[in-house]
Each structure stands twice: as C-alpha cells, then as structure tokens.
Amino acid sequence: MAPGSRTSLLLAFALLCLPWLQEAGAVQTVPLSRLFDHAMLQAHRAHQLAIDTYQEFEETYIPKDQKYSFLHDSQTSFCFSDSIPTPSNMEETQQKSNLELLRISLLLIESWLEPVRFLRSMFANNLVYDTSDSDDYHLLKDLEEGIQTLMGRLEDGSRRTGQILKQTYSKFDTNSHNHDALLKNYGLLYCFRKDMDKVETFLRMVQCRSVEGSCGF
C-alpha cells in the first residue's frame, strides 16, 4: 500500500473512532462517586415507580377479600427473575463480588425493558400518571447504561455493553376487566416491585464498598 493511501486510511479510521474515544474519555473523567449517585437515583426512581404502580393497581382492580388468593396463585407467586441466581438475604448479598452484583442488576433491568413499555396501558385512566410508558422505558434504559458504565469502571475502565436477554417477562395485558388478565398483571407488578427492590439494594451495596463515605443507610 502506498504511503499516501496508508495515511489516508489511518486518518479516516481516526475520524470514525473519535466520537467513541471522546465519549470514553468523558466517562473516565467523571468521578466514580458521581456515576454511583446517578445510578442510585435512577434505581430509586425505578423502585418507587414499581411500588406506586403496584399499589395503584391493587387499589383499583383487586378486591380486598380476594387479595390473599391473588397473591398465592401460582401465576402471581413465581417471577422470571427466580431463574436468575440472586442473593436472597443480606448475608448472601455480602458474599457476592461487586461485579457479580452489578451483573445480576443488569440482568434484572434488561428483563423489564420490553414489558415496561406497556406498564401504564393496564389502567383505563392513563391520566393517573404524569409520565408515559416511554418515560418508564427510558428510565430503565438509562439505568442499564449506568450499570454498564460502572461495570467497565470497576473492571478495566472501559464501558461494558451487554446483550438484551432473549427471555424476558411477558407484556402487561390491557384487558383490565378479564380475570386472567388481572391475575397476570398483578403477578407482573409484584415481580417488578420485587426486582427493582433487589436492584436498588445491590447497587447500594456496591456503592458502599466502592465509594468512601457512602455507607450511610
């Protein structure tokens, strides 16, 4: 290859890589504590969203005298995330490494990326909320990217990108007057609340270990 052609090729390659290098450099200059603060904020918002939606659905559609039977139905008592090996108590959580906890959190978030697009469609009155399904999706997507960034920083400094799980939770059913649909949605919301609680707990543990002075919980 002629010297001029080689130079042109290298220049073109550098120009193509420049945006990625700039982004990677920008991430490296952000203090780890700030990355954790942002991830924890998003994790808390996701957990609160799950709590609020679960309570709203329960109050709107689940009769009080049927709540016990709904909760103990096999369709509502099993979560897809139960197939993902996760710590079940604080002692088990403490035995996991930071990267293990982040990987588990990432899997949990990715399992909800598609279902959360239909989260608010369950409610006949969508005016109950000020935000939309797309806002919920972008919240989880932002959290996913934040966890990937933290994994990269804790490993070797580069941002990690993972594959979306092929098997995830099913979509929420919009037929709010059908008993089977109510049962399905109630079970999904129970799992959503349970999983987001885990994500927030795991991230808090990793933050406590990684950032000095952040264990005040």
Swiss-Prot record:
Keywords: Disulfide bond, Hormone, Metal-binding, Secreted, Signal, Zinc
GO molecular function: growth factor activity; growth hormone receptor binding; hormone activity; metal ion binding
Signal peptide positions on this chain: 1-26
Disulfide bonds: C79-C191, C208-C215
Keyword check for Phosphoprotein: no
InterPro entries named among the record's database cross-references: 4_helix_cytokine-like_core, Somatotropin, Somatotropin/Prolactin, Somatotropin_CS
Top-level taxon of the source organism: Eukaryota
Pfam families documented for this protein: Hormone_1
Ligand binding (Zn(2+)): H44, E200
Gene Ontology annotations for the cellular component aspect, listed alphabetically: endoplasmic reticulum; endosome lumen; extracellular region; extracellular space; vesicle
Record keyword Transcription regulation present: no
Note: CSH1 sequence only differs from CSH2 sequence in 1 aa.
Subunit structure of this chain's protein: Can be found in a monomeric as well as dimeric form.
Sequence similarity: Belongs to the somatotropin/prolactin family.
Function: Produced only during pregnancy and is involved in stimulating lactation, fetal growth and metabolism. Does not interact with GHR but only activates PRLR through zinc-induced dimerization.
Protein name: Chorionic somatomammotropin hormone 1
Source organism (scientific name): Homo sapiens (Human)
Gene name for this UniProt entry: CSH1
